[in-house]
């Protein structure tokens, strides 16, 4: 939940990765990133910096509940002095519930997550060795708490998942 990456191990022992660089560089597809996106989208809307096409009301309520804050400024302690990445990522569980209840902003964050997770896999495809595909040994294993909410991003994941026969030249 606090990070996201994809790893490839080829038959010759070579490894390749995509993502997993941490929250400062990019953890797209992780619970932390979804929490960050929810806060960013909500705050940008409330600042009138980048108005959201979806209501941010429910997400703001969830942020207030999760971080036990009443004003927007109070989030700063959780982003800096008291930063706790697993706690921050814990907001994602509340976002999942709101998405299941129909909140459009939360649903959009999960759709975006499906795209990111598919892109992790797509990024590694050029590195897949022919032997791995020929033997039928190419398995994609999905682990982590974000996958417990696969129903919320399955459509966007599969839409963006590579439709390929893996003809590698």
Regions found by a protein language model. Give the residues of each.
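ATP-binding/phosphotransfer module of carbohydrate and carboxylate kinases, centering on a glycine-rich
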Residues: 40-169
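Phosphate-binding/catalytic loop of phosphoryl-transfer enzymes
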Residues: 1-57
């Amino acid at each position: 939940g606090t990070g996201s990456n994809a790893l490839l191990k080829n038959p010759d022992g070579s490894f390749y990765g995509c993502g997993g660089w941490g929250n400062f560089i990019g953890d797209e597809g992780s619970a932390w990133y979804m929490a960050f996106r929810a806060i960013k989208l909500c705050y940008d809307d409330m600042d009138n910096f980048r108005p959201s096409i979806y209501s941010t009301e429910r997400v703001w309520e969830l942020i207030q509940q999760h971080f036990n804050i009443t004003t927007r400024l109070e989030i700063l302690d959780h982003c800096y002095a008291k930063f706790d990445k697993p706690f921050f990522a814990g907001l994602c569980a509340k976002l999942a519930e709101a998405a299941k209840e129909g909140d459009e902003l939360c649903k959009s964050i999960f759709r975006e997550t499906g795209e990111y997770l598919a892109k992790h896999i797509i990024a590694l495809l050029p590195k897949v060795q022919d032997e791995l595909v020929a033997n039928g040994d190419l398995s994609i294993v999905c682990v982590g708490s974000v996958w417990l909410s696969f129903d919320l991003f399955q459509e966007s994941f599969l839409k963006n998942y590579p439709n390929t026969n893996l003809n590698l030249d």
